[in-house]
């Protein structure tokens, strides 16, 4: 797949809930309503998808009575996808979807074994590849991936879920996690999915130079949901979605698709977006940025860590200037970044970030400080 581009499907869960007006766990349909599962796969294939994911994202032990029921559910999900693929036009790839395990009383080793078991049953179900989706921490999946790769040498992808600042739900930097994962030989592909819309995901990919020895994937949400009559809804965002996915494709991303809020109409719009399929890798990306998998170590200057010292490490012989920047009240950080760069160029020594000034809801002060520090190299 490296060097080519594949169109993946969109969301199964949110589309299933909307299509059948139900709040039940979509994965239970694998055994209860297999014809529904097959029909949704067929809709995505008709829209132009070349890669479909099994309806097994939340097929975990916590959701089913016992291991036998879980195994039956996963194999049924594989069967539904396989039946749909047989009726597709051309080659169709089936990805076995694995979502995060529930954090409960089980030990770390037990959860690692659970990941390995789920992957094993997907392999037995005949999938072409495995995809670990929407992860915020990779500690437990790396050992499981090693086990699965030894069992069957099929491609394994890992997709992280991040916020608009590039951090996962566990408060970890996606750039650092991707760097760690890029060093794992058993992992064939990396990417981002869920959590954010196409605009923020495109902005994150603009800041990354992607190692060429890995497959890269991008599957953002349709946008950001709103609540209507006790249901989470997504606005129709297809035109903007396709436009931003065209930008992402130009960064060298091979697998393009969607997550929450997307449906077959979104995938059809991607299939018809010529910019996506004729996009060539933007070789200028990352020339002045750090490469995820091959980051050049930088020597930390004393001024970065000790704002009261000069470049030689001696205490500055001047009055120090500290400026407070309040985090934005929404996701738009353009003004605060402009202010930070302005202050950087006017001999300000350190920036401070208050936590919820005036008691108003704002962007997280720690994450905002981290972002400013990374982009300006100022002490915060």
Tell where the protein language model's regions lie, with residue ranges:
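Domain-level signal for soluble alpha/beta catalytic cores
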Residues: 1-380
